[in-house]
Each structure stands twice: as structure tokens, then as C-alpha cells.
Amino acid sequence: MEAGGERFLRQRQVLLLFVFLGGSLAGSESRRYSVAEEKEKGFLIANLAKDLGLRVEELAARGAQVVSKGNKQHFQLSHQTGDLLLNEKLDREELCGPTEPCILHFQILLQNPLQFVTNELRIIDVNDHSPVFFENEMHLKILESTLPGTVIPLGNAEDLDVGRNSLQNYTITPNSHFHVLTRSRRDGRKYPELVLDKALDPEEQPELSLTLTALDGGSPPRSGTAQINIQVLDINDNAPEFAQPLYEVAVLENTPVNSVIVTVSASDLDTGSFGTISYAFFHASEEIRKTFQLNPITGDMQLVKYLNFEAINSYEVDIEAKDGGGLSGKSTVIVQVVDVNDNPPELTLSSVNSPIPENSGETVLAVFSVSDLDSGDNGRVMCSIENNLPFFLKPSVENFYTLVSEGALDRETRSEYNITITITDLGTPRLKTKYNITVLVSDVNDNAPAFTQISYTLFVRENNSPALHIGSVSATDRDSGTNAQVTYSLLPPQDPHLPLSSLVSINADNGHLFALRSLDYEALQAFEFRVGATDRGSPALSSEALVRVLVLDANDNSPFVLYPLQNGSAPCTELVPRAAEPGYLVTKVVAVDGDSGQNAWLSYQLLKATEPGLFGVWAHNGEVRTARLLSERDAAKHRLVVLVKDNGEPPRSATATLHVLLVDGFSQPYLPLPEAAPAQAQADLLTVYLVVALASVSSLFLFSVLLFVAVRLCRRSRAASVGRCSVPEGPFPGQMVDVSGTGTLSQSYQYEVCLTGGSGTNEFKFLKPIIPNFVAQGAERVSEANPSFRKSFEFS
């Protein structure tokens, strides 16, 4: 656990010591180049491609760039040639001042893979500055009593060049009284001193004028001159003397303006005006005069402006004390500027890699450098980012860092990161700087479209119009852009016999489903298929969902009368004995409806009758029965019209016409079971009742047929009016087949009637149905209960 914590801290917080680390951090020695100052923009420094051992194309492909400290770019890199060029004219004096050698550090940043190459450019000084005196004229007062060999300080000149091009020596115009010496300060700057060679005589020559020349070591040399005006004075025995020849003082850089930082003091043993002392800067530079102020009476040295350790960390100020007689003394004040933590750390961003693909692994997102102009602990810097981000900081060469992702990101969870890099120094108080980097995560097609439902159920009423919008499917994709654009399609059906392409279509853009043709519930009640949703990513991802289409029934089929047949042939006459009791079953109207549900619920009613009140129709099963006792007064022929109506909205109907013939002496037939019946006596009573009921209805019908045949054979006078009863064979119309199994019972019948005088037996046989699909439910139950039951009855 502790090891993990240490590793985390290494990733999250890095301490940077602002020291020159050298080329070892880069893994190789620094490459060194040189160029003379004042070269024009575009000057060729070196061919980096050759020095790095890379082809020009490879240099460009790796995104090579030059990174310098600060925001000013002194160099440019040509990706066409691989040349390192100057981006501007370089002024060595502006960049480095008196520092020698003048070195500019820069890095070559290469990516894919990330690589730093540390480089140095030395700027060679050219002799482009002449020595310049701070004062063009110097006024000296020298006592006539001054002894030969006396050294008199003079104001120095300044040359901004360095090395041999800097100021080298001083000369004066030849004369018999003076010569000049060239001295060097501790910092290497040279200053002149005037040496008296011969005593002066004011009566002989009260004033002298000399030319002081400062020469540098350039080729050709440059020079600067100043005029020295010397006035020979009468005797002033004592010159002012400072209490200290050298004052050293340390001053904080944030010391307030007008603060007294040091007080110099000098004394003069003379009296009167010769003993009165005034203080002044001795040939001070413009920078010193802008920074300090000297009280001429008290010797207090004050600040005129704030000090800046990062710009100048020390000053050497020469002070002159002069009495009223013109004699002077000299002292030097060394001001050491003490660094204060007054500069916050700075961050310079070199490159940002954004956006990055969400599936990328450990990836460099940004390269940046940090710096602090302060020194010591004030210049030590810590870098950190928030702990809850999937990134870490990785130190690179010198003061460079890389911001690296820990692994693959998820754009669908978070598509943008605002990363705050905090850099803090170790000064007191600590100063910090925050820098925000926005990293965008680009989408990768890693999410398949997802339907809002696993399956969809759509309801369509039959007889719809073609191109009817029957419903929609919808899928969404968590990706973005083209990776989230979904295209819908119909997948091949699992049932090869389903003509899906002629039934429905789908809009590829929005998932709307359309019926291509009118659907028929009686032909197709339901079907299912699968739809696919595919995105436009590469590679494309897809998903699928199940769609069930349920066709709703419409009342588009009228009832169809199976019996009695209504095909325009000779009507079938039902025979009823006049002795029949009320409720006697005359016949049964059998009808079917091709619809389903309540659209197929049929009801029956007697619409017309020759003699109202004699017959009635049961509303639910179509049975026609006698309503009262028959009498001799009732007509022999009756015509009944039965209305068959379904329960749809609006209802549909059909009519059946029945012909009933009342006959005399025709009694209720008795139909005993055949001899094989005792073997079935053990059957369930309920089954027997069902069989007997079915046999009774069939026997009544067969009996009527036999009677009709007998009358025809006897050629009675009433045969013409009765006619022959025949039931045509053959199947009923195919459109009435109940494909759902939920419609009205549909059954065709065929009867064979055998009635002969000498046969010795009377049999009524149920023959096999012409259309096997129409099987009466009641008959199925009888067949299942006793499949060996013989469908034959005998008249007694």
C-alpha cells in the first residue's frame, strides 16, 4: 500500500530544481552550435535533419519543433529542408549583457515517439559598439602643492561588447605633466587613473586641457573620447577622506521606494569652505542614477525605484566626497540585491495533442516547461494535477514535463477534460500558478446501436390501404458523429415461405414500417420478422430486434349458409308428420362465417313464414322446430325464410329458404342401435347421449328423404308438387374455409339413401365428409371417445 502511494505521488507531484541539468537527462550530449550576432533573419545555423540522423520527411512526420525558454522564438525549423534558421536578428548585448559566453539553450521536440534533443547556441560577439564615457567633459581642480606621482581618479567609459571587443585601455594626449593608467575592477571593467608626473604651477599655466581616449580590442578597434579640463588651485592642504573605502550592503528586492539603504561619511581636516564636504555619484551609469539617489549633505543613499533581483542582482556605486577647495575623496558602495519570492512560477506550453481517440493507450497529451525567475528555494517548483483524473505528469529533460493519459478513455462517459496544472514554488510565502488545458476525447465506434425494445408488437387491421404506416422501431447509438448515425433494414426472415419483401418495408433513416399491400386476416393472421440497426462507423456495428405484426379481423365476410343449399337448384323439402308434437325438430340451418371472434358469432331468426306462429327458429343453433300442434287445417306446404346474422359492426347477414311439407300418417321414427351396440354398452353415458342426439337429427333428415323417394316411386298424384330432394355433392366454396380454427363450424355433408321394398333392411349411413378440413366439433368428441362407433342406424 505504501509503495502504491509513493508511485502515485511520483505521478502526481514532481519537484523541479532549477539547475542546469546538462545533456545527461536527454540521454545524449548537448549539441553545440555558434553564430555571430547581428546575422539577418533566415541565416542558416545548421541542418538538423543531418545532425539528428533523420530524413527530412521523417523530421516532418515526427512533428519536429524548436522549443525555447520563454515565449520568444529565436529560431525556426524548415520542414522542407531540415535547416535550423534564425527567426530574428540576435543582439548579444541585449540577450546576455556582459555575460560571456552568451549561450542560448533550446530543445528539439520530436513526437511519435516523444524525444527531446538538448542544444546550445553560442552567440559570438562582434565589435559593434564603441566605448562611451558617461561624461563627455571632466573638470578637475588640482592643488599646486600636489606632489608628482599623485593618482587622480577619472571617469570611466563603457563598452557593451565583451572579450577582446570590450574596452582594453585608456590614453591621453601627450603632455609633460600627466600620464594615464588603465586599472581593472573586480568585475573586470577597466577604469582610468590620471598620474601627475610634474608639479603644477598656476602662475605658469593655470588651466590645462587634455583628451582622454578609451580603446577597445576589436579589429579594427573602436574608440571613445572625453575632454579633461584641469584647473590648478592654490593650496588646500587636506582632501576629504571616507570612513570606509568600501561599503557593502544587502537590500531586499521588495524594499520600499525612498528607503535609505546606506549612509556614507567622509571628513576633512581643513576648516572653512575647505572643510565643507558634499557627496555625489562619481561617474555613475544611467541605471544607477535611475535606481539610487544620494543626499549631497548627509550622504544618505536612497532607493528611487524597486529593485529586481531577476534583472540585476548587484550594483557597484562610486561616490565622491568633495570639499570647498575642490579636493575630493572616493569610496565605493556594493549593493547586493537579496532575492524575495516575488515571481510566481511560469508555464510555457509547447504542444497539445487534442483531441485523442478514446481507445488510445498511454498517450502524451501535452508538452510544457516551467520556470521561476527567483533563486534558491524561491525558484524550486512543484507541479501537480487533480487526483481524480486519468492523467499523470512525467518529467522530461531539464524543466520540461509531459502530460500523459493513464490508459484508454471512454468518450461516452466523458468527452472533455479540463485539466488544471498547478505549479507552486517553495518560497515563503509560496506562490502558485494555475494553467488550464482542455483535452477533447474523439469518438471511436465501440458501441452498437441499441433498440428501445427487444421486441415490438404492431397491430394492423385487415383490408388496410397499401403504404400504410403501421408502426416504428427506434435504436440509439451512444457514439457520436457518423458512428452514431443509424440505418435500419429488414433482415431475411427465418421462415423461407414468408414473402416479407412484399408485405412490409422500412424507412432506412427513421425506422418507420409500412405495409406494402392490403392484409387479409383470413389468409394471414400474424407474422414476425427481424429488423437490423447498423451504424456508419468503421467497422460498422449492428443489432437487431424482433417485430411481431398481428392482423386484426374486420367484419368483411357475410355468413354463408351450408344447409340447406342456396344454389338455385331444386329446393329440398323437409317432411313433417302432422302428428308431430310442439318442439318437433324440423331441420337445422347450418351456416359459417369466415371472420373470427364476435364477427363470427351467428344468430338466427325467422324472417318470413307462410303461416306465422307454426314454426320457430332457435337463435343460437339454427334449429327449426314446430311451435304448436299441427292440425288438418294447416296448409300442407310451407315456405320459411331464416335470417342468419353475425355480431360484427356493422353486422352482415344472409338468408336461407326452407320448404316444409306436412304429411299424414308419418310417425316419429324409432332408430334402434345395431346388433353391435351391446359391445358399447359399457361406454360412458355422456358419450352415448351425444351419439344418440346426433343420430336423431340425422335420422329425421334421412327419414324425410326416404319418404320422398317412396312417394316418387309410387307415382302418386302429389309427386309432382313434392319433387325430388337431392343434395349436390362436392365441396363448398374454398373461401369459407376457417383457417384460424376459431370461426364458426364449417362442415359439408353427403348422404346416401337406400330404400327398396325387398332389401329386408333399412340403413341410414353417414358417409365421409367431402371436405376433410370441416370436422364438426361434436363429432370429434364422439370419435375421440369411441373411434370404433359405427355410424349406422336401422328403422324398425
Swiss-Prot record:
Question: What SMART domains does the record point to?
Answer: CA
Q: Please give, as recorded in its UniProt entry, the membrane topology of this protein.
A: Single-pass type I membrane protein
Cytoplasmic compartment residues: 712-796
Listed transmembrane segments: 691-711
Instruction: List the keywords (alphabetical).
Output: Calcium, Cell adhesion, Cell membrane, Glycoprotein, Membrane, Repeat, Signal, Transmembrane, Transmembrane helix
Query: Which cysteines link up through disulfide bonds?
Result: none
InterPro entries, per the entry: Cadherin-like_dom, Cadherin-like_sf, Cadherin_C, Cadherin_CS, Cadherin_N, Protocadherin/Cadherin-CA
Q: Does the keyword Transmembrane apply?
A: yes
Q: Name one GO molecular function term.
A: calcium ion binding
- Is the keyword Cell membrane in the record? yes
Concerning PROSITE patterns, the annotation shows: CADHERIN_1, CADHERIN_2
Sites carrying a glycan are: 169, 418, 436, 567
Give residue ranges on the Extracellular side.
27-690
Q: Name one GO cellular component term.
A: plasma membrane
**What is the protein's major site of localization?**
membrane
- Residues spanning the signal sequence: 1-26
Q: What region holds the Cadherin domain?
A: 35-133, 138-242, 247-347, 352-451, 456-561, 568-671
Compartments in which it is found: Cell membrane
Q: Which GO terms describe its biological process?
A: calcium-dependent cell-cell adhesion via plasma membrane cell adhesion molecules; cell adhesion; chemical synaptic transmission; homophilic cell adhesion via plasma membrane adhesion molecules; nervous system development; synapse assembly
**Per its database record, what is this protein's job?**
Potential calcium-dependent cell-adhesion protein. May be involved in the establishment and maintenance of specific neuronal connections in the brain.
Q: What is this protein called?
A: Protocadherin beta-3
Q: Origin organism of this chain?
A: Homo sapiens
